[in-house]
Amino acid sequence: MAGFKQLSGLVVPLDAANVDTDAIIPKQFLQAITRIGFGKHLFHEWRYLDVEGTKPNPEFVLNYPQYQGATILLARKNLGCGSSREHAPWALADYGFKVMIAPSFADIFYNNSLNNHMLPIRLSEEEVEEIFQWVWANEGKQIHVDLEAMTVTVGDKVYTFELDEFRRHCLLNGLDNIGLTLQHEDKISAYEKNIPAFLR
């Protein structure tokens, strides 16, 4: 898994608070157990006018032409509330989002996002409002996220954010739970060679 250090990208301004995981990925699309293929169902009930998902809703922000190819999602407080389904960050990541910015995230969704190599950034409500205003006024312009410096640069303004150092280390180095375990492969192998035969 590639490490995450910096990203410059377009921002989708999702002007809504308390966006729950059922809105992010509705329950009828949860049958699959792999992480791929969920992006086409992201925000399905908001994004499409029909059940089949063939008629895009032109009034939903994700369908606006100027936000196609965006890699950063901007939202209001309590993003990812509701059920604990891990499919929600799967859908966001499969669509192409790498960073989410909001005043707050539901705890389980926040951790699931980090576990799936996405960066959820908490900023104050005032800072998030400033970014919304900038995005609306600067159509087509990118913002810059620097995980090493822990900053978000929006136009000529720089915002700082916090992240647990262990989580930051994992993102910077592209490490998931398996990758972390494999860092100790030599020690694991040495231990296995020395345990009694009846325990093997």
Swiss-Prot record:
Q: In which pathway does it act?
A: Amino-acid biosynthesis; L-leucine biosynthesis; L-leucine from 3-methyl-2-oxobutanoate: step 2/4
Q: Which GO terms describe its cellular component?
A: 3-isopropylmalate dehydratase complex
Alphabetical list of Pfam families matching this protein: Aconitase_C (PF00694)
Alphabetized, the UniProt keywords read: Amino-acid biosynthesis, Branched-chain amino acid biosynthesis, Leucine biosynthesis, Lyase
**Does the record's keyword annotation contain Amino-acid biosynthesis?**
yes
GO terms, molecular function: 3-isopropylmalate dehydratase activity
NCBIfam families attached to this UniProt entry = leuD, PRK01641.1
Q: How does it assemble?
A: Heterodimer of LeuC and LeuD.
Member of which family? Answer: Belongs to the LeuD family. LeuD type 1 subfamily.
Identification of the protein by name: 3-isopropylmalate dehydratase small subunit
Q: Which organism is it from?
A: Haemophilus influenzae (strain ATCC 51907 / DSM 11121 / KW20 / Rd)
